[in-house]
């Protein structure tokens, strides 16, 4: 579960390393976000010569969470990190590569491009 003030790692090659969530999109008083949800973030830590700068406000979709993801068949899935991928206003990823596995729920939510760029879909 990701909420306001949560810090996430960035799982793409935009140059951002860490972002801080300050809004969960999808409702006026929505508190928590999980895999496949879109959040608004501020970039906190960047690599040199990156396409995004520190302090930029970006949209991101969550691809991994440490909290359990429950599936319809009763199985659960948990990752080691809270990670996201920075997207543009149309929902396409800004980077050209995705690092690490992503959950299958990403494809179910309509982020086909992210799931196709990922090395592994769990």
From Swiss-Prot:
Keyword rRNA-binding: yes
Ribosomal protein as UniProt keyword: yes
Record-linked SMART domains: Ribosomal_L14
Keywords: Ribonucleoprotein, Ribosomal protein, RNA-binding, rRNA-binding
GO MF terms held by the record: large ribosomal subunit rRNA binding; structural constituent of ribosome
Example GO BP: translation
GO CC terms: cytosolic large ribosomal subunit
Pfam families, sorted: Ribosomal_L14
Gene3D superfamilies: Ribosomal protein L14 (2.40.150.20)
Family: Belongs to the universal ribosomal protein uL14 family.
Function as written in the Swiss-Prot or TrEMBL entry: Binds to 23S rRNA. Forms part of two intersubunit bridges in the 70S ribosome.
PANTHER family: 50S/60S RIBOSOMAL PROTEIN L14/L23, LARGE RIBOSOMAL SUBUNIT PROTEIN UL14M
Assembly: Part of the 50S ribosomal subunit. Forms a cluster with proteins L3 and L19. In the 70S ribosome, L14 and L19 interact and together make contacts with the 16S rRNA in bridges B5 and B8.
Protein name: Large ribosomal subunit protein uL14
Record organism: Chlamydia muridarum (strain MoPn / Nigg)
């Amino acid at each position: 579960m990701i909420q306001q003030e949560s810090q996430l790692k960035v799982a793409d090659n935009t140059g951002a390393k860490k972002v801080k969530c300050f809004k969960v999109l999808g409702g006026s008083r929505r508190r928590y976000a999980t895999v496949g949800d879109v959040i608004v973030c501020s970039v906190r830590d960047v690599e040199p010569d990156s396409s995004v700068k520190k302090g930029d406000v970006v949209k991101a979709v969550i691809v991994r969470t440490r909290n359990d993801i429950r599936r319809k068949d009763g199985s659960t899935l948990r990752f080691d990190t809270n990670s996201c991928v920075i997207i543009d206003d149309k929902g396409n990823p800004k980077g050209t590569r995705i690092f690490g596995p992503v959950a299958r729920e990403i494809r179910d939510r309509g982020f086909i491009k992210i799931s196709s760029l990922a090395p592994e879909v769990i």
